[in-house]
Design a protein with these regions (language model features):
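Hydrophobic alpha-helical segments and helix pairs
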Residues: 90-133
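Surface-exposed beta-loop interaction hotspot
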Residues: 119-154
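Glycine-rich, often proline-containing surface loops adjacent to acidic residues and nearby aromatics
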Residues: 22-30, 98-115, 141-149, 213-226
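Short, highly charged C-terminal tails/helix-capping segments
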Residues: 75, 144-151, 256-266
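Aromatic/basic-lined ligand-recognition segments
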Residues: 13-15, 83-95, 99, 110, ...
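Conserved short hydrophobic interaction patches
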Residues: 49, 53, 124, 128-135, ...
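Long, compositionally biased interface segments
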Residues: 215-266
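N-terminal low-complexity, intrinsically disordered segments
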Residues: 1-102
Length: 266
């Protein structure tokens, strides 16, 4: 069950920048309405218009998406869900650090580590959105999501998670055992706006650093908003992107401690 959370509204926690941000991937995704005004010809046009920035080899991605009705309809019918297959074409940049993915009713922009900052990622999002809009002319937006995946590497394998994270996993020392690994998922709903925050927190093993004496933690934050009855006008897209990004920043800062911040600024 999702938990309700309060936003700081006009009093954000304050924007922080780090010398070594732990961000491994940042994503912004749009889902449009209608979803059936896209075809292979449009994909070709899109590829041509973004090739200056994304010159890598395109690849196809197929995935299943759960479409749910969040509220009962006028007859009182309970919420239902359906599954549909989405086919996207992913187009990376030459160095593979940036990517855009496009398909029927869906567009996403991605950037990988090293993250160069919101000042670089935001124009990338806006540019891709403008190209999609010029080609498909969607009537509106039904979902926007901002997702940041962070890999936080502690300096020692026995480093105490409670020193670096504000809500560490329980240790259960009274059972005579130690914590080996964990996966925690929390879903939150904001009180002021119908915005959902999903936090995935886990201890992970980096394959390429198995011999390094350290501990790695995944902190995955996904902030999204959906419009079920009336689509968001296209001219309001970037203002909502900014708002979701602001809340993602606040959520990230709320998950970590000053000791983590020292790591990011080392």
């Amino acid at each position: 069950m999702a938990k309700a959370v309060k936003s700081n509204g006009s009093q954000p926690l304050g924007r922080r920048t780090y010398k070594n941000p732990p961000i491994t991937e940042a994503t912004c995704e749009f889902q449009f309405t209608p979803v059936d005004n896209w075809n292979l010809a449009y994909t070709g046009i899109f590829l041509e218009r973004v090739k200056a920035r994304y010159s890598g080899k395109p690849r196809e991605q197929r995935l299943l998406q759960l479409d749910s009705k969040q509220l009962p309809d006028a007859s009182g019918t309970l919420p239902s869900a359906s599954v549909r297959e989405i086919t996207k074409v992913q187009i990376p940049s030459a160095d593979g650090r940036e990517m855009v993915a496009v398909g029927p009713g869906i567009l996403s922009a991605h950037v990988l580590k090293p993250y160069s900052g919101w000042e670089t990622f935001r124009p990338q999002i806006e540019e891709a959105l403008a190209v999609y809009q010029a080609i498909a002319d969607p009537s509106g937006i039904r979902r926007i999501g901002i997702r940041y995946i962070n890999l936080i590497e502690l300096p020692a394998p026995n480093a105490e998670p409670s020193e670096y994270f504000s809500a560490p996993p329980t240790k259960n020392e009274e059972l005579g055992c130690r914590l080996d690994t964990f996966v925690i998922r929390h879903e939150y709903l904001y009180d002021d706006e119908p915005i959902r925050l999903v936090v995935n927190f886990a201890k992970v093993q980096k394959i390429e650093t198995v011999t390094v004496n350290g501990a790695s933690y995944l902190l995955d934050l996904d902030v999204s908003r959906e419009w079920q009855t009336e689509a968001l006008p296209m001219n309001r897209a970037m203002s909502l992107v900014e708002e979701l990004r602001r809340r993602e920043r606040e959520a990230f800062e709320a998950q970590i401690t000053p000791k983590s911040r020292e790591l990011f600024d080392a």
